[in-house]
């Protein structure tokens, strides 16, 4: 077994068990004690697990309950967001009925969309304005306006989503976790994300690597409930997942 394959297997075992001993890994991977210890040292140095006496434990997830405002988020990881946004926009085909979630990466998508035969629904005023400026047909959800993320949220928005059946949808997330799925800091926004996902055939979450192994206050979908579009991913446990697309260009 190649080194990278062992790394991925070790991290996968840790994700499911939370902790593992050297002896268990020797059995699971059919590898020597020296090989396992060397692998654990390397993964610990990379910050992918925490090495303890006799084995390893899952590296503590980063928890976040704070929502940064849109202005501060727009310039974070902008190159990565542009790559992700361009690839995501290319998934939209003529005739698609698309849900576009509020967020800085979903907003960047709009500049790359070429199919004017697609119809859009969004909970972001800025997205609706830009889509209309570019000549797209767009519907804006009604409800409570959340100033921090500039999103329409709450029960009225959820009720408005009941009548829609989307072919494709694109969402942002504050946290992406194998165990806790996709999460966001605020309940009212999570409600809208959850309902729109439930009414969508193909779901895509747009997330740069900084969102991985992060957990926010409210989970709105399980990890397997969407395809993740990212770029520059270095985490083996996610790289081997069939629902993760790592954009190369």
What are these model-predicted stretches?
Residues 2-5, 9, 15-23, 28, ...:
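HTH-adjacent hinge/linker in prokaryotic transcriptional regulators
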Residues 1, 5, 75-79, 83, ...:
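Residues at secondary-structure transition points
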Residues 11-12, 22, 45, 51, ...:
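Conserved phosphate- and dinucleotide-binding cores of soluble alpha/beta proteins
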Residues 23, 33-34:
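Key DNA-contact positions within bacterial/archaeal DNA-binding proteins
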């Amino acid at each position: 077994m190649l080194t990278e394959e062992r790394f991925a297997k070790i991290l996968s075992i840790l994700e499911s068990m939370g902790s593992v001993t050297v002896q268990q890994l020797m059995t699971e991977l059919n590898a020597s004690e020296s090989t396992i210890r060397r692998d654990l040292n390397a993964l610990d140095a990379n910050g992918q697990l925490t090495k303890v006496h006799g084995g390893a434990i899952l590296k503590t997830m980063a928890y976040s309950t704070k929502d940064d405002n849109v202005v501060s988020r727009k310039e974070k990881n902008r190159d990565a967001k542009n790559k992700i946004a361009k690839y995501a926009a290319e998934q939209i085909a003529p005739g698609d009925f698309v849900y576009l979630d509020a967020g800085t990466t979903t907003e960047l998508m709009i500049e790359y969309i070429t199919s004017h035969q697609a119809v859009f629904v969004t909970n972001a005023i800025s997205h609706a304005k830009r889509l209309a400026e570019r000549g797209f047909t767009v519907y804006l959800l009604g409800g409570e306006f959340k100033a921090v993320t500039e999103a329409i949220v709450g029960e009225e928005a959820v009720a408005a989503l009941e009548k829609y059946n989307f072919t494709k949808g694109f969402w942002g997330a504050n946290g992406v976790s194998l165990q806790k799925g996709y999460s966001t800091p605020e309940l009212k926004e999570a409600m809208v994300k959850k309902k729109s996902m439930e009414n969508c055939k193909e779901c895509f979450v747009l997330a740069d690597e900084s969102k991985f192994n992060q957990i926010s206050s409210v989970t709105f979908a399980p990890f397997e409930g969407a395809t993740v579009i990212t770029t520059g991913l270095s985490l083996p446990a996610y790289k081997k997942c069939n629902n993760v697309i790592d954009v190369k260009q």
